[in-house]
Amino acid sequence: GDILAARDTITCGGRYMNDNVKDTARSIMNDLGAADNAQNRDCAAYAADRLTGRVCASDRDDLKLAIENMTGGANTVLYDNAGRPSIMCAIPTMTMDDLYGNGDPSVHPAWVVDGDVKKVIYISKYMNVIEDGRAYSLPMRSAATYNTFEDCVNACLRKGKGWHLFTNAEWMAVAQWSKRNGTRPHGNTGDGCYHRATYERGLPATMFCRRAHLVKTGSGPVTWNHNHNASGIADLVGLMFEWVGGLRLMDGVFQIIPHNDAALYDENLLKIDSRRWRAVTTDGYLAAHGELNTLKVDGTVPGDALEEDHLLGRPVVSTELNNRSYLGAHTDGNQGYLDCQFCDLKAADGMEIPELAKILG
């Protein structure tokens, strides 16, 4: 009885322990495990597994079934190569007609990975935390911040095959679904609340100048989810800046990784010299870097060589780069920048934006 009580106490308190205390607890459990009594050994193994983040098969099944039952299968639990859980949203295959109502029966690129059409894609329900170098989708946490693109890519890849940074194709599919279904998500866009409805608040995770800065993942109302339902993807709007894979600007040129191939398990996939990057031409075809008539971001006014943060003007989508923002020598410092809301981004006179570019943002 005393051993069982100790097991439960250590198990329940494991998440609150620092590493030194956890090491001590593991040592105690190891000592117990050396005892002849089989019950002692079982208790020691159980507690040690829970302390190190592993979950036995029955616990895994219970957690997975509970989450799926509560959400009607819209959410599930997936485990990584360390045996640790993430709560995920299961998004079944959607066609272009499903998302745009255009009569096109072809599958949206987000469900096409290396030529294979997926029946479902899994997207983190919560902004991720990073623990032991791996990213996890968990509720009521302070999400990871101040990480480079490479940090975030690697935190996903370390979890094993199938795990990847949220791709641009996936992001655009979710955003379009919300738009079409009238559930554009709200979020933490102003000191812990939604700026257009300040009564919508999340639970503070960090404070700045006595005001909530970040909020705990998933702590906002259901309107902060992509479907305005408890089963939805939380915090897509506000909270923090997010990285996505498969879209970049290279020397002013829009480049994508076709379909949802940015989800492939490949440590070199998203690197600067990856051969999978493609530009988009004005007629909607994919092209190698340097080819003519590809989409670019140009300025509306001439740039300068000032190494300081300052607004130059608005960007415009063009096939030419006539007004580069920065004209000085290479620097990692601040430079002039172009700015406008995405919905206000225009194409140069006489130019049409191809559908592929619209679909992938």
Predicted regions and their residues:
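Short aromatic-cysteine micro-motif
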Residues: 107-236, 265-267
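Short secondary-structure boundary/capping segments
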Residues: 179-185, 248, 255-259
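C-terminal, surface-exposed recognition/capping segments
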Residues: 32-33, 49, 172, 197-214, ...
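Amphipathic alpha-helical segments in structured regions that serve as interaction surfaces
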Residues: 7, 18-31, 40-51
